[in-house]
A protein has these predicted regions:
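Nucleotide/phosphate-binding catalytic cleft detector across ATP-hydrolyzing
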Residues: 1-199, 221, 277-282, 286-309, ...
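Short, functional N-terminal and low-complexity linear motifs
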Residues: 201-208, 254-260, 334
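Glycine-rich phosphate-binding loop plus the immediately following alpha-helix
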Residues: 15, 38-39, 45, 172, ...
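Conserved acidic E/D residue at the C-terminus of a beta-strand in Rossmann-like folds
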Residues: 9, 203, 225
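A cross-taxonomic marker for long C-terminal extensions/tails that follow the last structured domain
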Residues: 193-218
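C-terminal amphipathic alpha-helical segment
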Residues: 236-297
């Protein structure tokens, strides 16, 4: 029986998984918990598995605090009820039922993709660094180790698997692996200067930002902190700017377009609001800088002691769009890291702020987790040989 490793990154707005170093897949994490005998007459929007997430998760060996549980996720959950459960920033991730639903759904989807139903799997997952204690890791393992079945009601399919090992890594620290190494695990030449000394990792999620300090590429225990400042904070600022300038109340979709493109959908055209977006990003960077300044006081390390700040996560992306008339990409604002750099260099003009080298900063955690998973598989295979 081959060794199967499922790598997972459970975010606040969406989650990602990959099986045995395969392609990264994104899946939803909004949920509507329902009773097992609930009649769900909704017709899925398509045959895509993500439009058919009416599932029942059952732990078939050992005890569970959370299962069995039937749950709708993604588009079915949104269509069934306006009231959806989403990841909460007011409770530890390791103690939220939705975390375990999301992890096991990602595992089941991965098993479906790879055709490995009924087999043993190991999980590599992430928690906020502040939650990475022995008690929390043991709690996670007690819930996830064992045999499970996931029934997909709309697809009339059932997948089973046995989780034999769970490896828990700190969010952001996993991302740092993707900064230091290419996807083939070769060291990035451009990151050689940061291989020794202190590096701060800032992972800007939808609801929170995780900070962790590395020394010589290794996570320093007890330096993980989580701040209630994330992409949603930036969204609120952007919405306020829109109201201030135009008096308009806009949809969430319009705000997302402005964040990603720097322009606001306006009738059959667009309204340039790059100036307002830059102002909102600067305000967000100022608040993030204040958190970082407070963080360094907490961990007892000065800003001038670090070589670089690695910035990743969906909340750190630059804004641009493709102009079809001009046939070119138009950048409307820099990533948050650029504005954070300006603040940090007021204190230490030699500190570097580094964005994720491979493009989409939202992918840094899952790519780093895959690299960790590949090393895990290689080590296990070596022991068996």
């Amino acid at each position: 029986m081959s060794m199967n490793v499922v790598c997972l990154d459970e975010g606040a707005s969406s989650s990602r998984y990959a099986v045995n170093s395969g392609a990264v897949k994104v899946y939803p994490n909004n949920a509507r918990l329902i009773e097992e005998d609930t009649v769900v007459s909704l017709v899925p929007n398509s045959d895509d598995v993500l439009d058919n997430l009416d599932i029942t998760i059952t732990k078939t060996s050992g005890e569970s605090r959370y299962f069995p549980q039937r749950v709708l996720m993604g588009s079915l959950a949104e269509r069934f009820s306006r009231s959806n459960t989403r990841p909460s920033m007011n409770a530890n991730k390791c103690k939220q039922k939705l975390t375990y639903i999301t992890v096991l759904l990602g595992t089941a989807l991965g098993c479906l993709d790879a055709g490995i139903g009924g087999e043993e799997v190991s999980l590599i997952m992430n928690l906020p660094p502040v939650e990475l204690t022995d008690d929390n890791v043991n709690y996670v393992k007690s819930e996830l180790l064992g045999a499970f079945s996931v029934k997909f009601h709309k697809l009339e399919k059932e997948i089973s698997f046995t989780v034999t090992d769970v490896v828990v890594k700190p969010e952001g620290v996993s991302a740092s692996v993707a900064f230091f190494y290419n996807k083939d695990a070769s060291p990035r030449v451009t990151m050689a200067d940061y291989s020794t000394g202190y590096v701060l990792v800032v992972d800007i999620g939808a609801s929170t930002s995780d900070l962790a300090l590395l020394k010589d590429k290794k996570f320093i225990e007890r330096t993980g902190q989580t701040y209630k400042l994330g992409g949603n904070t930036l969204r609120d600022k952007v919405r306020s700017k829109i109201k201030e300038v135009s008096g308009l109340e806009v949809t969430d979709e319009a705000v997302e377009t402005l964040l990603s493109e720097g322009r606001l959908p306006y009738g059959n055209s667009y309204r340039d609001m790059s100036k307002e977006l830059v102002a909102a990003k600067r305000e967000f960077a100022d608040e993030l800088y204040d958190s970082i300044d407070s963080y360094f006081t907490t961990v007892g390390v000065g800003i001038s002691s670090i070589k670089a700040v690695f910035v990743c996560g969906g909340g750190s992306m630059e804004s641009s769009y493709f102009d079809e008339k001009e046939n070119k990409e138009v950048k409307t604002s820099e990533p948050v890291s650029k504005y954070l750099l300006e603040r940090l260099q007021e204190v230490c003009d030699s500190v570097d702020v580094v964005s994720y080298p491979d493009g989409n900063p939202r992918m840094a955690n899952i790519i780093g987790t895959i690299l960790i998973g590949n090393a895990y598989r290689a080590k296990k295979a070596q022991k068996k040989a």
